[in-house]
Amino acid sequence: MISVNFHKKDPSEKIKEATLNLLAEKGYEAISMRKIAKEANVALGQLTYYYKTKDSLIVLVVKEVLEAFYNEFEEKVNNSDNKIEVIVDGIESVLKEETKIERLLITVISQAQVNKKLQKILGDSWSKILNLIATCYMNEYEKLTMEHASLKSRLLVSSAIESIVEKILKVEFSTDNQATLIREAAEKLGEE
């Protein structure tokens, strides 16, 4: 579902792509500027020329990934007649295909507890996604108040996050089963 296209010939973009890959594979604490430079195949001096600290680089990469995710998600939703279906399809796509993004999300959520910049970026993105879903519920089901639509969007996203955690932890997880449950939940949320 998500496509962040870093321009691979530009050293700055190679660095961002390497950071994204390492964050998703190893987690925040396990990476260093040296490891990022090695993964990007650039000299450490070149890395620090573009990005002074690991934190500033990670914050930038996370911000770009979340913006790309939201923009792609919003465009697909806005270009559809059945917006709730597109939302559920997007969640299903992440559950079936996007292991790197799932791991990145869990890493960023855990790191946001101690990094205020990441906390703000993640919180802003989270709010935008929840508002988009709530607006779709309100438009689809005209009887809903914004308060109820907001609650329904949170329940749907919470189900998706729970499924991502279960998938990562390999806790009795079946992608098809989870996707079906989320699809059914989305439909039931609209009926109430």
Language model region names:
Residues 1-10:
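N-terminal intrinsically disordered/low-complexity leader segments
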Residues 14, 18-56, 60:
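Helix-turn-helix
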Residues 60, 74-100, 152-156, 175, ...:
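Hydrophobic alpha-helical connector segments
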Residues 63-69:
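Short, basic, alpha-helical segments at the C-terminal edge of helix-turn-helix-like DNA-binding modules
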Residues 90-91, 105-109, 156-160:
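Short alpha-helical scaffolding segments that buttress acidic/His motifs in well-ordered protein cores
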Residues 97-123:
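Amphipathic alpha-helical segments used for helix-helix packing
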Residues 119-123, 127, 139-189:
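Hydrophobic/aromatic-rich alpha-helical bundle segments in the mid-to-C-terminal region
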